[in-house]
Every structure is written in C-alpha cells, then in structure tokens.
Amino acid sequence: MGSVRVAIVGVGNCAASLVQGVEYYKDADPDSKVPGLMHVQFGDYHVSDVEFVAAFDVDAKKVGLDLADAIGASENNTIKICDVPNSGVTVQRGHTLDGLGRYYRETIEESAEEPADIVQTLKDRQVDVLVCYLPVGSEDAAKYYAQCAIDAKVAFVNALPVFIAGTKEWADKFTEAGVPIVGDDIKSQVGATITHRVMAKLFEDRGVVLDRTMQLNVGGNMDFKNMLERDRLESKKISKTQAVTSQIRDRDLGADNVHIGPSDYVAWLDDRKWAYVRLEGRAFGDVPLNLEYKLEVWDSPNSAGVIIDAVRAAKIAKDRGVGGPILSASTYFMKSPPVQMEDTKGRAQLEAFIAGEVER
C-alpha cells in the first residue's frame, strides 16, 4: 500500500519521540510482540511505512533546521532513544495565531521568517496525514490547521485538547469534505488518564461507589511550563475530567468532588511526568475504601506510542474514502472523542476497523 506521508505542526517533545520511534522500530518483526507498540503492523502499514515529509514550527531555533536536528533543538528535553539520520525535511515557519502563550514568549524567540503556505505545502508534499502537536490553549491555531487539512484533503490527527472531532460543526466539515479526523487530545499508552479511567471503572464494576477523586500532575517540559498560564487550561481540564467521569454510570459526582488537571512545573523533571491519583469510595456496608497511587513516566514517548497508531488509522480511513471522525480510533486513542466507550470496547472497535468490519 505504500507509505504514510506525515506532516507535523509543532516540533516539540512529542514530535521528537514520534520521529525517533519510527526510526527505532523500523526493523520490528510484524509478527512478534514488540515492547512499546500496540501494533507493529497496523492493517496494511508497518511502522517503517511512516514517512515524515513536512514540518512546521515558529521557534527561531527550529525553523530552517532539518527535522532530525530540530527534534533536539531549543527547549526539547525528552529522552533520546536513538539517532535519527538526516531526513531531508526542513522545518518551515508555521502560523502563530494564539499558539504562543506568556511562558512560551518568555522562553523562546519567535522566528522572523515569513510563514509558509500550509495548504500548498501539504499538496506539494503529497501529505496523507497532518499531526497537530500545538501547545495547550492553541484554540485558533489548531482550528486554522484543521481547516488547512480540509482544504488540502489531508487526514488530521488532533493530539491536543481543542475540541474539533468532538464538535458537530467541525465533524460535519470533515465529513462533507471526505477528510478523516482522529481526535481529540491524545490518551497516552499508560498515562494518568487511562489508569485513572481503569480504576474508576473497576470501582463501578466491583460495586464500590466512587464519591470523590483527584489527579495531580507535575512535569518539567514546555507543556507543563505553558500550562502555568491557567487561562489556557480550560479545554485541557475539561478533556482530562470527562475522560475519567465518563466511566461512572448514571451518576454525576459533582464538580466539587472531582479535581483533575496539571498542577505545577518542576524544571528538573525534564520530560518526565509524575501523576498523583486518589480515589475515595464506599464499599460493602458503606465502609470507606480509598486507593492512592503515583505514576512516573517519560511524557512524550508515552504519547508517541499511541500517535504511531493514530496516523496509520487516519491513513487507512483515507485509503477507504471515509471522511469525518474515525470513531473507533478516536475512542481508543483520545481523551475526548466524539463518543466515549469503555476501553475494552474501544479496543474491539479499533480491531474491527482495522479488519474492515466497521466503516469508522
């Protein structure tokens, strides 16, 4: 079936992990279980079929560099898992709009280069899938790139908490244009959101009433520094919260009983994230039952392990001529999909989609 030609907007830590990951797993045996991957072979596409053909950023230290160099430039501080050879892809100047918040502007220098013609570039490079890795709070910028994807007839993977796939207006736009979208807000392989979801569902399934819960996250990357600007966090908090509360059947915990969100920036953590989660409930005889745990992860590789499948799902949909939200992939890969499902059901739907048994 050929390659999956990918463009990236936002060459930060998540992009760095994704680009490294494709190189790291390029020779993985498609018939074996490989640590770190849900699918070595995803339908017709092996990891090695993913090819990066365009990249956009606004950081002066990244624009003009080869993608292989840009992923280690400026404030990027994720773990290095392999060397990446020269890609032949030069990072182009993207469009800023609301993509740079206060802390980004205090930290980086915005490129003085003229912004690229995004739609024309996507067409010229024959891009299959555009991955949106913009900073949290980039509402206008994310929607701008979503429209570019529609105009260029390029599938869109929305990794950030701006509600596009999950809103009727945008879902209709993608459907009418015949362009696939997978979104919104990437759900990491084994991160705070999916473990919290599983624990909340476990309480429900075992007859324990969940009364209140919290999830506190700290990290040392630019994502966490950006999120110190609380005005940019509204959609992020909504996304992380509904991902967990959607697992509680027929009951609203109430806003005062749920606190989920980023909490602070700790520079020495680099791209590591520490999540502290607590669930308080009542078991047999209304006896209190509390669960508390701490999760430590490298944030960006944890995300890349899911995006590597999301881009291939988007390409399969494009190959099949399916436009609009790809519900199976969105449900399993994203925190805020158009339709929330239990993760086991979402996985089953995804496998059915890969096999061609369901349209989307």
Each language-model region and where it sits:
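N-terminal glycine-/serine-/threonine-rich beta1-alpha1-beta2 phosphate-ribose binding loop
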Residues: M1-Y145, L233-I238, A275, F284
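Active-site-lining helix/loop region of Rossmann-like oxidoreductase modules
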Residues: V9, S48-E51, K62, D69, ...
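Gly/Ser/Thr-rich loops at beta-strand to alpha-helix junctions
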Residues: G10-A16, L134-D140, L160-G166, K187-T193, ...
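Short glycine/serine/threonine/alanine-rich loop segments
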Residues: V127, K153-V154, V179, V208
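Short catalytic-loop micro-motif centered on adjacent basic/acidic residues
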Residues: L130-C132, F156-A159, V182-D185, R212-T213
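Rossmann-fold dehydrogenase core element
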Residues: K173-I186, G207, D211
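NAD(P)-dependent Rossmann-like dehydrogenase/reductase catalytic/cofactor-binding core
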Residues: N302-R360
